[in-house]
Structures are given as structure tokens and as C-alpha cells.
């Protein structure tokens, strides 16, 4: 048979004009339209006033299957940072063998424990870091729904990762170190990525809060100049350990408040830095929690975060709190089967569980 399109150019143009009247600002043709249809449409709507609606800009990260919005007044969010071989000998050994089983497990555990975004870092000796980063992005995006944060000290690795990432990623990070700064900003623009602004320069750590503010303004101005927007930026509060600098927390708080109130910028910080070298770090971390990037593998921190959101009446926080406590109760409920009484709880069908969770590496073992 032959497909027939009966709409004439004149009829097509009339419909287009009605769309413009209703507020549509972009129109065109598809199957069945010819150059005559497009010319008639253009002639018809050219004299009409086009309504250009300015949609509010939003801080949004995406994966293949999930969108995460970062709102200045929204609930606390966690960036999971466990996928990093630094200090993890077992993970390093697996990566040298080309295995990503631990990476998949870490990704899944962090997502299940409340992480909204997952940081991915493959920086270690003895591997092809770029190829391992690409392999990891493929496996992690297959395993979990969370958007990813691409973390590398090498510009070419960040760009290669952004090129294949199926969504809008977060770059960790862009500082005022000239060699990287001049390359990474255009890369963020090219791939439409958000980025973490790290207030460091070639001179090293800023000596005080004012120097930190100046670095933030310098990077912000450069980003705006090339067409990026404030909503594309998350400022790292640059937390130092309070054991070495008694003013570390206050300086971080100052940076966060300045960025939010004066510059309308989102902020983040590495929670564990504040308590480095101190005993019973959990208490220091908990006190710092509301402005922190936490390790979502620690239930106590995540439970405190969800409870804090509820007390501050953040949108949807009551439901999140109830759901989380229900999940916690289910995890802690006494098991009745033989495996549980023996101290281990195995899935009824391990192979099915591996397939369901995309854990290809363990299927043969089962």
C-alpha cells in the first residue's frame, strides 16, 4: 500500500497558527510535510507574536531511569562516596583483576540506604583508569537508578566518562587550578553537566573564608561568561578537620551561608573530614550532618538526616521517615527460617536474586 497525507499546505499552516495562538513557541512538520507545507507555515506565523516563556531553571541530575532535583530549600541529599579504591585493598585487588562485583554491591547498598547520587572514582595504580571508569559507568548505571558524579583528577577521563554517560552527570570537581580550570569549564558546558566548585587554587588551600569566597566568585564569573548558569554549580564547603583547625566548622558554615544567601548557589561538603583524627567521630559528624555529604552506608547518619527533614517540615519528609523506619524494622525483625537461625539469611533462589539485581559476576558461583 501507499501512505497518503491529505492535509494541504494551507490547512497545515492554519493549524500551525492556532498552535501559536495557544502559546506554542516552536512548531514544525514531520511525516507528510513537504517544503511547500513548511513555507506556508512560515509565511502564516511570521507576522504573529511568538510567546517566549521563560521556564525557571532547575538543578537537575539524571540517569537513564531517574531524575534528581537539588532544591536550595529542599530535603537533605546524600552523595554516596564508597566507590573509590583509596584505602580499600580488597576493592583494589578486584579492580586489578578486572572485576566489578564489589563496585556493583557498593552501588546497590548505597542506593538502598538512601543515597540520591553516587560518586564514582577509579583513581589507583596498576589499572587503565580511563577504561575502568568507562566500564564502571556502564555497570553502575545498569545496576542502580541513581545519577552519577564523575570523580577523577584527569581531565581526559572526565570527558570520556561524560561522553558515554546516559544522562546528566555531576563533575567532581572544578577548582581554580589553572591547567584543569581552563579545560573543565568548557567540557561541563559541552556535555551539559553540573559541577562541584572546589574553592582551591594553584596556591593550595585558601587561608581564610574571604579568600575562599573570592575563589568561588572567580569560578562562578568564568562559568557564567561561557554560558553556564548558577543552577549548574554546587559549591564544596571545603571542610577541614576541627582537630587541626578549631574554626574549620565555622568557616565551612560561613561558606555555605554565603553561597546560598548571597549567590543562590547549592552547596555540599565531605562530612567525615570534620572529625578526622578524633575519637567517637560519629558524634561530631552527626552535629555537622545538616550541611554534609555523608557516607550512606552508616544507618545512624541517614536516620538522623531523615528525622531532621521531618522536624523541619520538608516536603514529603514525613512519608520518607515512616518508610525508612518501616524498612529498618523489617531488617531487624527476627528471622524464623533455618538459614536465619544459623546466622545467615540466604535468598530462596540465589541465581534468581543475582539475575534480578544484575549481579552477573556471582551467577556462576551460585
For each feature predicted by the language model, list its residue ranges.
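Domain-level signal for soluble alpha/beta catalytic cores
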Residues: 1-236, 240-366
Amino acid at each position: 500500500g501507499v501512505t497518503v497525507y491529505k492535509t494541504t499546505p494551507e490547512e497545515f499552516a492554519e493549524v500551525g497558527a492556532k498552535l501559536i495562538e495557544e502559546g506554542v513557541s516552536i512548531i514544525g512538520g514531520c511525516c507528510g510535510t513537504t517544503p511547500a507545507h513548511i513555507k506556508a507555515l512560515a509565511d502564516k506565523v511570521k507576522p504573529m507574536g511568538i510567546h517566549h516563556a521563560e521556564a525557571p531553571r532547575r538543578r537537575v541530575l539524571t540517569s537513564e531511569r531517574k531524575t534528581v532535583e537539588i532544591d536550595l530549600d529542599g530535603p537533605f541529599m546524600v552523595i554516596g562516596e564508597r566507590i573509590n579504591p583509596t584505602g580499600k585493598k580488597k576493592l583494589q585487588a578486584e579492580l586489578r583483576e578486572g572485576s566489578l562485583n564489589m563496585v556493583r554491591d557498593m552501588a546497590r547498598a548505597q542506593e538502598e540506604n538512601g543515597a540520591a547520587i553516587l560518586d564514582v572514582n577509579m583513581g589507583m595504580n596498576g589499572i587503565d583508569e580511563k577504561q575502568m571508569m568507562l566500564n564502571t559507568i556502564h555497570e553502575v548505571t545498569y545496576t542502580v537508578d541513581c545519577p552519577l558524579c564523575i570523580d577523577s583528577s584527569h581531565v581526559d577521563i572526565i570527558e570520556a566518562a561524560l561522553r558515554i554517560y546516559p544522562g546528566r552527570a555531576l563533575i567532581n570537581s572544578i577548582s581554580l587550578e589553572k591547567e584543569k580550570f581552563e579545560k573543565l569549564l568548557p567540557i561541563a558546558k559541552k556535555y551539559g553537566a553540573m559541577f562541584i566548585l572546589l574553592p582551591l587554587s594553584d596556591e593550595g588551600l585558601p587561608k581564610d573564608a574571604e579568600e575562599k569566597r573570592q575563589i568561588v566568585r572567580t569560578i562562578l564569573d568564568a562559568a557564567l561568561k561561557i554560558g553556564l548558569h548558577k543552577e549548574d554549580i554546587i559549591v564544596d564547603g571545603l571542610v577541614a578537620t576541627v582537630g587541626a583547625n578549631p574554626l574549620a566548622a565555622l568557616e565551612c558554615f560561613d561558606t555555605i551561608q554565603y553561597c546560598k544567601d548571597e549567590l543562590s548557589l547549592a552547596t555540599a561538603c565531605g562530612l567525615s573530614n570534620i572529625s578526622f583524627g578524633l575519637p567517637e567521630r560519629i558524634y561530631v559528624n552527626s552535629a555537622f550532618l545538616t550541611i554534609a555529604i555523608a557516607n550512606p552506608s552508616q544507618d545512624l547518619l541517614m536516620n538522623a538526616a531523615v528525622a531532621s527533614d521531618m522536624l523541619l517540615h520538608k516536603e514529603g519528609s514525613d512519608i520518607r521517615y515512616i518508610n525508612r523506619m518501616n524498612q529498618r524494622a523489617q531488617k531487624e525483625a527476627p528471622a524464623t527460617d533455618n538459614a536465619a537461625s544459623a546466622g545467615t539469611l540466604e535468598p530462596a533462589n540465589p541465581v534468581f536474586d543475582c539475575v534480578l539485581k544484575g549481579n552477573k559476576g556471582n551467577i556462576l558461583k551460585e
